[in-house]
From Swiss-Prot:
InterPro entries: IRX15/GXM/AGM. This is Glucuronoxylan 4-O-methyltransferase 1. Disruption phenotype: No visible phenotype, due to redundancy with GXM2 and GXM3. It comes from Arabidopsis thaliana (Mouse-ear cress). GO terms for cellular component: Golgi apparatus; Golgi membrane. One of its GO terms (molecular function) is glucuronoxylan 4-O-methyltransferase activity. Expressed in rosette leaves, stems, flowers and siliques.
């Protein structure tokens, strides 16, 4: 369904405001850094750098121009985007993993300026199209073996001990674990994970069952401890609703805004004595 024109306008205003705020913060930081520099033998080099150092990063400028002029708005609503952007505002620069590549990808990457934002996408042709427009975005192709019509069976499979055992998804015996991602995806400690893909609105589509499960397992298996903020979009649909509650856990859910749910999942690798006794869900 096409969004209402008024909603599109409000969303565009929010995106431009967020990016403009980010740019203002960047400029203020750059100015403060420059003003605090002392005279040293490297004065000449610092002076030569000042213009380039204070220059607006190309990625931010491109994002601001794109969302100011584009007639296409992201799929999430203004209020939904605000939930994730508030968390990014506190944690960025950070490691941000996004299942899905779309019209909002440049926004997420820009809001995490200075951090690493990675997109996992099922459609190779779409990846190529986006890369032509925004080559600075880091994205990888993902193949999903699951189908929406298998969801009922998979949620039962997920209750078994092979799926509730905490470990690296690459070596998991659980049918829900995604095993074919690039090695660095498993080896990175992700601060935020957004599940807004793959396609899940018809029976033969891959659905988000494995993406949701794997996001939760990556958060629990995070080696350096800490917590991971996990977001799931389209929870108005049955699969996103059931699988997020089952594998990200209602006890870890912090907020729901519209079709977006926000979970905060602790690492189960914190080195404490209770680590091995911690239940899959609280």
């Amino acid at each position: 369904m096409r969004p209402k024109a008024n909603q599109n306008h409000k969303l565009k205003v929010l995106l431009v405001f967020l990016l403009a705020t980010l740019i203002l913060i960047f400029i203020v930081r750059s100015t403060l850094t420059s003003s605090q520099e002392h005279q040293t033998p490297q004065e000449t080099r610092s002076t030569r750098c000042s213009g380039a150092c204070n220059k607006l990063p190309r990625s931010l400028a491109q994002a601001l121009i794109h969302y100011s002029t584009s007639v296409i708005t992201p799929q999430q609503t203004l209020k939904e985007i605000a939930v994730s952007s508030r968390v990014l505002g506190k944690k960025s620069p950070c490691n941000f993993l996004v299942f899905g590549l779309g019209h909002d990808s440049l926004m997420w990457s820009s809001l995490n300026y200075g951090g690493r934002t990675v997109f996992l996408e099922e459609d190779e042709a779409w990846i190529k199209q986006i890369k032509r427009r925004f080559p600075m975005l880091e994205s990888y192709h993902v193949t999903y073996d699951s189908k929406v019509n298998q969801a009922d069976n998979l949620i039962e499979v997920g209750k078994g001990p092979e799926c509730t055992a905490i470990g690296d998804p690459r070596y998991s015996m659980c049918q829900l674990a995604l095993k074919g991602l690039p090695a660095e995806i498993y080896e990175t400690g992700w601060d935020l994970i957004m599940v807004d893909a793959p396609t899940g609105y018809y029976d033969e589509a891959p659905g988000r069952m494995t993406a949701i499960y794997t996001a939760g397992m990556m958060a629990r298996n995070r080696k350096q401890g800490g917590e991971t903020d996990v977001f799931v979009h389209d929870v108005n649909r049955e699969i996103e609703d059931k699988f997020s509650k089952a594998f990200l856990c209602e006890g870890y859910m912090k907020k729901q805004e519209g079709r977006l749910r926000h979970f905060i999942i602790p690492s189960y690798r914190d080195g404490s004595e209770s680590e091995s006794n911690r239940p899959f869900c609280p």
